[in-house]
Amino acid sequence: MSTVKVNGAKNGGERMVLPAGEAAAKYYPAYRENVPKKARKAVRPTKLRASLAPGTVCILLAGRFRGKRVVVLSQLEDTLVVTGPYKVNGVPIRRVNHRYVIATSAPKIDVSGVSVEKFTKAYFAKQKRSGPVKKDEAFFAENAPKNALPAERIADQKAVDAKLLPAIKAIPNMKEYLAASFALSNGDRPHLMKF
Protein backbone atom coordinates (compact mmCIF):
# COMPACT_ATOMS: atom_id res chain seq x y z
CA MET A 1 0.00 0.00 0.00
CA SER A 2 1.16 3.50 -0.78
CA THR A 3 -0.16 6.87 0.35
CA VAL A 4 -1.37 9.48 -2.13
CA LYS A 5 -2.17 13.12 -1.32
CA VAL A 6 -5.79 14.06 -1.95
CA ASN A 7 -7.10 17.61 -2.47
CA GLY A 8 -10.10 18.92 -0.60
CA ALA A 9 -10.55 19.90 3.03
CA LYS A 10 -13.12 17.21 3.77
CA ASN A 11 -11.16 14.34 2.14
CA GLY A 12 -8.63 13.85 4.94
CA GLY A 13 -5.55 14.98 3.03
CA GLU A 14 -4.20 11.54 2.02
CA ARG A 15 -5.47 8.12 1.00
CA MET A 16 -4.03 4.58 0.98
CA VAL A 17 -3.86 3.13 -2.55
CA LEU A 18 -3.04 -0.38 -3.81
CA PRO A 19 -0.20 -0.80 -6.34
CA ALA A 20 -1.25 -0.97 -10.00
CA GLY A 21 -0.86 -4.75 -10.22
CA GLU A 22 -2.97 -5.45 -7.12
CA ALA A 23 -5.81 -3.07 -7.92
CA ALA A 24 -9.27 -4.50 -8.56
CA ALA A 25 -10.10 -5.15 -12.20
CA LYS A 26 -12.02 -2.40 -13.96
CA TYR A 27 -13.55 -4.92 -16.36
CA TYR A 28 -15.41 -8.08 -15.43
CA PRO A 29 -16.44 -10.60 -18.10
CA ALA A 30 -20.17 -10.81 -18.85
CA TYR A 31 -20.05 -14.60 -18.46
CA ARG A 32 -18.17 -16.31 -15.70
CA GLU A 33 -15.38 -18.48 -17.02
CA ASN A 34 -15.61 -22.06 -15.85
CA VAL A 35 -12.66 -23.08 -13.75
CA PRO A 36 -12.10 -26.84 -13.92
CA LYS A 37 -12.39 -28.64 -10.61
CA LYS A 38 -9.23 -30.04 -9.18
CA ALA A 39 -9.24 -33.81 -9.47
CA ARG A 40 -9.17 -35.42 -6.04
CA LYS A 41 -8.90 -38.95 -7.39
CA ALA A 42 -5.57 -40.55 -8.11
CA VAL A 43 -5.04 -43.39 -10.57
CA ARG A 44 -3.84 -46.31 -8.53
CA PRO A 45 -2.81 -49.74 -9.78
CA THR A 46 -5.53 -52.41 -9.74
CA LYS A 47 -5.44 -54.63 -6.68
CA LEU A 48 -6.05 -58.20 -7.81
CA ARG A 49 -7.63 -60.66 -5.38
CA ALA A 50 -5.31 -63.03 -3.55
CA SER A 51 -7.52 -65.98 -4.57
CA LEU A 52 -6.68 -65.39 -8.26
CA ALA A 53 -3.17 -66.83 -8.10
CA PRO A 54 -1.70 -68.67 -11.12
CA GLY A 55 -3.12 -72.19 -11.38
CA THR A 56 -6.53 -71.31 -9.91
CA VAL A 57 -9.58 -72.67 -11.72
CA CYS A 58 -12.08 -69.86 -12.36
CA ILE A 59 -15.53 -69.45 -13.88
CA LEU A 60 -15.96 -66.70 -16.50
CA LEU A 61 -19.08 -64.59 -15.89
CA ALA A 62 -19.21 -62.43 -19.01
CA GLY A 63 -18.14 -62.30 -22.61
CA ARG A 64 -18.08 -64.84 -25.37
CA PHE A 65 -16.98 -67.69 -23.10
CA ARG A 66 -19.27 -66.99 -20.12
CA GLY A 67 -19.93 -70.06 -18.02
CA LYS A 68 -16.68 -71.73 -19.05
CA ARG A 69 -14.12 -72.87 -16.50
CA VAL A 70 -10.59 -71.63 -17.14
CA VAL A 71 -7.12 -71.80 -15.60
CA VAL A 72 -5.34 -68.59 -14.53
CA LEU A 73 -1.87 -68.45 -16.12
CA SER A 74 -0.63 -65.10 -14.79
CA GLN A 75 -1.63 -61.62 -13.66
CA LEU A 76 -0.95 -58.53 -15.74
CA GLU A 77 -1.12 -55.02 -14.22
CA ASP A 78 -4.92 -54.88 -14.38
CA THR A 79 -6.12 -58.15 -15.94
CA LEU A 80 -5.72 -61.91 -15.76
CA VAL A 81 -4.29 -64.14 -18.48
CA VAL A 82 -6.41 -67.30 -18.68
CA THR A 83 -6.86 -70.32 -20.93
CA GLY A 84 -9.29 -73.27 -21.12
CA PRO A 85 -6.99 -74.96 -22.17
CA TYR A 86 -8.23 -74.77 -25.76
CA LYS A 87 -7.99 -78.53 -26.28
CA VAL A 88 -10.30 -79.19 -23.31
CA ASN A 89 -13.07 -76.58 -23.61
CA GLY A 90 -12.21 -74.28 -26.52
CA VAL A 91 -11.16 -71.20 -24.51
CA PRO A 92 -7.97 -69.72 -26.02
CA ILE A 93 -5.31 -67.69 -24.20
CA ARG A 94 -7.01 -64.39 -23.45
CA ARG A 95 -7.11 -61.45 -21.06
CA VAL A 96 -10.00 -61.17 -18.60
CA ASN A 97 -10.97 -58.47 -16.13
CA HIS A 98 -10.81 -59.96 -12.64
CA ARG A 99 -14.25 -58.54 -11.77
CA TYR A 100 -15.90 -60.95 -14.21
CA VAL A 101 -14.39 -64.08 -12.72
CA ILE A 102 -15.27 -66.37 -9.80
CA ALA A 103 -12.37 -68.24 -8.22
CA THR A 104 -13.29 -71.82 -7.36
CA SER A 105 -12.05 -73.97 -4.49
CA ALA A 106 -10.99 -76.72 -6.94
CA PRO A 107 -7.40 -77.98 -6.56
CA LYS A 108 -4.85 -75.68 -8.15
CA ILE A 109 -3.21 -76.78 -11.39
CA ASP A 110 0.58 -76.67 -11.60
CA VAL A 111 1.43 -73.97 -14.17
CA SER A 112 5.10 -73.63 -13.24
CA GLY A 113 6.13 -75.33 -16.50
CA VAL A 114 4.26 -72.79 -18.66
CA SER A 115 6.31 -69.81 -19.84
CA VAL A 116 4.12 -66.70 -19.58
CA GLU A 117 6.72 -63.97 -20.16
CA LYS A 118 5.47 -63.21 -23.68
CA PHE A 119 1.84 -62.68 -22.62
CA THR A 120 1.94 -58.90 -22.14
CA LYS A 121 -0.40 -56.05 -23.09
CA ALA A 122 1.39 -55.71 -26.43
CA TYR A 123 0.81 -59.41 -27.19
CA PHE A 124 -2.97 -58.98 -26.92
CA ALA A 125 -3.14 -55.58 -28.68
CA LYS A 126 -5.24 -55.47 -31.85
CA GLN A 127 -3.42 -54.97 -35.13
CA LYS A 128 -4.22 -51.67 -36.85
CA ARG A 129 -5.84 -51.80 -40.27
CA SER A 130 -3.72 -50.65 -43.17
CA GLY A 131 -5.27 -47.91 -45.30
CA PRO A 132 -8.62 -46.14 -45.04
CA VAL A 133 -11.79 -48.23 -45.07
CA LYS A 134 -14.95 -46.79 -46.61
CA LYS A 135 -17.94 -47.53 -44.40
CA ASP A 136 -20.48 -48.24 -47.16
CA GLU A 137 -18.24 -50.68 -49.00
CA ALA A 138 -17.30 -52.50 -45.80
CA PHE A 139 -20.96 -52.74 -44.73
CA PHE A 140 -22.26 -54.21 -47.99
CA ALA A 141 -19.25 -56.40 -48.74
CA GLU A 142 -20.38 -60.02 -48.85
CA ASN A 143 -17.04 -61.74 -49.31
CA ALA A 144 -15.01 -59.51 -47.01
CA PRO A 145 -11.72 -61.10 -45.92
CA LYS A 146 -11.76 -62.25 -42.31
CA ASN A 147 -8.88 -61.47 -40.00
CA ALA A 148 -6.90 -64.69 -39.80
CA LEU A 149 -5.37 -65.65 -36.48
CA PRO A 150 -1.57 -65.24 -36.60
CA ALA A 151 0.40 -68.49 -36.75
CA GLU A 152 2.38 -67.31 -33.72
CA ARG A 153 -0.78 -67.28 -31.55
CA ILE A 154 -1.71 -70.80 -32.66
CA ALA A 155 1.78 -72.07 -31.87
CA ASP A 156 1.70 -70.39 -28.44
CA GLN A 157 -1.68 -71.99 -27.67
CA LYS A 158 -0.41 -75.45 -28.62
CA ALA A 159 2.70 -74.97 -26.45
CA VAL A 160 0.63 -73.91 -23.42
CA ASP A 161 -1.85 -76.78 -23.92
CA ALA A 162 1.01 -79.30 -24.13
CA LYS A 163 2.33 -78.14 -20.73
CA LEU A 164 -1.08 -77.90 -19.03
CA LEU A 165 -2.71 -81.17 -20.14
CA PRO A 166 -0.38 -83.49 -18.14
CA ALA A 167 -0.91 -81.33 -15.02
CA ILE A 168 -4.69 -81.46 -15.53
CA LYS A 169 -4.72 -85.24 -16.07
CA ALA A 170 -2.75 -85.69 -12.83
CA ILE A 171 -5.78 -84.42 -10.85
CA PRO A 172 -8.73 -86.87 -10.91
CA ASN A 173 -11.85 -85.61 -12.77
CA MET A 174 -10.24 -82.22 -13.48
CA LYS A 175 -10.44 -82.58 -17.26
CA GLU A 176 -14.17 -83.33 -17.08
CA TYR A 177 -14.68 -80.46 -14.60
CA LEU A 178 -12.99 -77.97 -16.95
CA ALA A 179 -14.92 -79.26 -19.96
CA ALA A 180 -18.29 -78.80 -18.22
CA SER A 181 -19.93 -75.36 -18.35
CA PHE A 182 -21.39 -73.58 -15.33
CA ALA A 183 -24.99 -72.37 -15.45
CA LEU A 184 -27.73 -71.42 -13.03
CA SER A 185 -31.24 -72.86 -13.19
CA ASN A 186 -34.49 -71.94 -11.47
CA GLY A 187 -34.25 -72.09 -7.70
CA ASP A 188 -30.44 -71.86 -7.60
CA ARG A 189 -29.14 -69.39 -5.05
CA PRO A 190 -25.67 -68.19 -6.10
CA HIS A 191 -25.14 -66.24 -2.88
CA LEU A 192 -25.40 -69.51 -0.92
CA MET A 193 -23.19 -71.55 -3.24
CA LYS A 194 -19.63 -72.53 -2.42
CA PHE A 195 -17.62 -72.34 -5.61
From Swiss-Prot:
Gene Ontology molecular functions: RNA binding; structural constituent of ribosome
Major location (coarse): cytoplasm
Keyword Ribonucleoprotein attached: yes
One annotated GO biological process: cytoplasmic translation
Protein localization: Cytoplasm; Nucleus; Nucleus, Nucleolus
GO cellular component: cytosol; cytosolic large ribosomal subunit; nucleolus; nucleus; preribosome
InterPro entries, alphabetized: 60S_ribosomal_eL6, Rib_uL2_dom2, Ribosomal_eL6_CS, Ribosomal_eL6_KOW, Translation_prot_SH3-like_sf
Pfam families associated with the record: Ribosomal_L6e
CDD domains: KOW_RPL6
UniProt KW keywords: Cytoplasm, Nucleus, Phosphoprotein, Ribonucleoprotein, Ribosomal protein
Function: Component of the ribosome, a large ribonucleoprotein complex responsible for the synthesis of proteins in the cell. The small ribosomal subunit (SSU) binds messenger RNAs (mRNAs) and translates the encoded message by selecting cognate aminoacyl-transfer RNA (tRNA) molecules. The large subunit (LSU) contains the ribosomal catalytic site termed the peptidyl transferase center (PTC), which catalyzes the formation of peptide bonds, thereby polymerizing the amino acids delivered by tRNAs into a polypeptide chain.
Subunit note: Component of the large ribosomal subunit (LSU). Mature yeast ribosomes consist of a small (40S) and a large (60S) subunit. The 40S small subunit contains 1 molecule of ribosomal RNA (18S rRNA) and at least 33 different proteins. The large 60S subunit contains 3 rRNA molecules (25S, 5.8S and 5S rRNA) and at least 46 different proteins.
PANTHER family: 60S RIBOSOMAL PROTEIN L6, LARGE RIBOSOMAL SUBUNIT PROTEIN EL6
Membership in a protein family: Belongs to the eukaryotic ribosomal protein eL6 family.
Protein's name in the database: Large ribosomal subunit protein eL6
Gene that this sequence comes from: rpl6
